[in-house]
Amino acid sequence: MNKITTRSPLEPEYQPLGKPHHALQACVDFEQALLHNNKGNCHPKEESLKPVRPHDLGKKEGQKGDGLRAHAPLAATSQPGRKEVGLKPQHNHQNNHDFNLSPLAEGATNRAHLYQQDSRFDDRVESIINALMPLAPFLEGVTCETGTSSESPCEPSGHDELFVQQSPIDSAQPVQLNTKPTVQPLNPAADGAEVIVWSVGRETPASIAKNQRDSRQKRLAEEPLALHQKALPEICPPAVSATPDDHLVARWCATPVTEVAEKSARFPYKATVQSEQLDMTELADRSQHLTDGVDSSKDTIEPPRPEELLLPREETLPEMYSLSFTAPVVTPGDHLLATMRATRLASVSEQLIQLAQRLAVELELRGGSSQVTQLHLNLPELGAIMVRIAEIPGKLHVELIASREALRILAQGSYDLLERLQRIEPTQLDFQASDDSEQESRQKRHVYEEWEAEE
């Protein structure tokens, strides 16, 4: 027996199920007797407010007691397979003569009002049962376990409990929930003839896709070989890793490459769908098995690589992207980066050694108060050059002694060096000659003095 708790019958939106009317009439008569016997002993109490009922219309004020009586009980009808529904019996109040019975009277009034609608509710239940009777063969084995839970948002708040007794329903076919489809071939000799039988139950899109994929893989594994084909050569290693698709991997390895190419040509849509469903790891494993087992000396078709299955070929790019495809912009910096290469550290040291050998540097340091340092250089193009470095308080004096042609080349090189240094980092650098005193004094003039007229 299943126990179902409903809302209190005092709430108008919930209707109690039917009960044998003789028990209801006895309960109401008992409550009326208690009210009549204790009418003089009870303290004066306020009249309880009662809702207006259809059977109270047209009655006089003195006939209030008649409203507590329920209508005559209807003949109880028993039908096979119907649920016996009833209210839990109330506690006995025979020893409670000294208590205030106004709540009891109010409860009896409300019950009498609700019991009048039992006949209409019985008709509704009977119509629902008649509508559900054709579904009886599909409902065998389905049980409904119900109970009270404090966490449920629809927990009833009433005081009465409802008891439901279910009778067994005859059925011929049990219900199977969430089962996989079974594939039954119509003709074992026919290739591709099959019937998918679905069981009764709720299936999600993910489970449907998985079932279809399993049936397709099973069909590929059990597909008969061609009549003109000979025994398959063993091109796969004997030990195959245990994966969920062991039979599929074994079949792929055992199938020659030529047969795979012929099937792909005959059924392009089938090959495309199958390649889309397989992930990259499976494709890589299968291509590895094919390349390891096939002899390279024989004329065989090279298996496609995983990236070739996903990316289009180069010759199809202009056709596919003729409208939207644009060539990438190549800048001069891209060409420069393409020509640049990383230099080795050893090459830099070798170049420094060669430069030192060609310069033939001689360093002479003389002691004394003057602190003058002389540097003698013998250059291939400039010839012999002497550099004198004198340390003056607060300054460093550098003097170059060379031929006239060498000094001209050095002046041009110093100008170029100064210009490049100013571009990299602007600093206050200046190369001045001691002979041009007029030019030095002219640089010290103010900029506005250049506009004055000379006398």
Swiss-Prot record:
Alphabetically ordered keywords of this record: Cytoplasm, Plasmid, Virulence
Compositionally biased residues, Basic and acidic residues: 43-69, 439-449
GO cellular component term of the entry, any: cytoplasm
Segments for region (Disordered): 38-82, 430-455
Pfam families reported for this sequence: Flg_hook
Keyword Cytoplasm: yes
Chief subcellular location: cytoplasm
CDD domains: T3SS_YscP_C
Cellular compartment(s): Cytoplasm
Biological role: Component of the yop secretion machinery.
Family of the protein in this entry: Belongs to the SpaN family.
Protein name: Yop proteins translocation protein P
Organism the protein comes from: Yersinia pseudotuberculosis serotype I (strain IP32953)
Gene: yscP
